[in-house]
Amino acid sequence: MFLSKLTVDVTSRHFRRDYADIHQMHRTVMSAFPHIEDDIPARQAHGVLWRLDPSDRGFLLYVQSHVEPDWSSLPDHYLTQPQEVRNLQPALQAVTGGSKFAFRLVANPTRAVKREEAEQTKRAHAGKRAQPRHVVLRTPQSQIDWLVRQGERHGFVIPTGRNGQPDIAPYPALRTQGQSQTGTQPHRITIDHVRYDGHLIITDSAKFTTALRDGIGRGKAYGCGLISLAPPRN
């Protein structure tokens, strides 16, 4: 598994295009990976997750993948300095039960809501599957509760802080939009990002390693799901 750190040039017209359209950003990220002649999406096949973090001078683009990327296809002047790519295998060996880490995660916390009967009928007539509607969680408490539930599924818990509350802080991040094409039909994309900073304790190393590799939550193609770990803070 590999992690790329890209220092983007915020004056680049190509980056500004990507920043304005989340699907274009996805395409730029995926340009570093081989095309897949299969039914499995290339992002899923290569285990690609990415996150755009604000920095003092603009943005840092982090990209995690199962295979080593080739960033030579990036447009000229997209970066202000050479990319940094490191092998994460040594870090994965530190993932053991009971270990505590500081972490950052940008996610798209939602809850599934059953569609109204009229809406389900309309979807059926259009040949679409009867899927629930996903509603964005907007209050800090509901966002924290969502991550606690994710921890139960993915082998970690959020410890209690000094104030008696979960040691985590959700911050509303930017809402991103874009447009993809399904056949001849354009499809509008809207992703509400929430950034989580805090601490976690691993309870099941196998489940947590899978979560590290594959990400958690929805919106993984669009900047969500990547978990970054660091030594715990005092």
Regions found by a protein language model. Name each.
Residues 1-234:
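RNA-interacting cores
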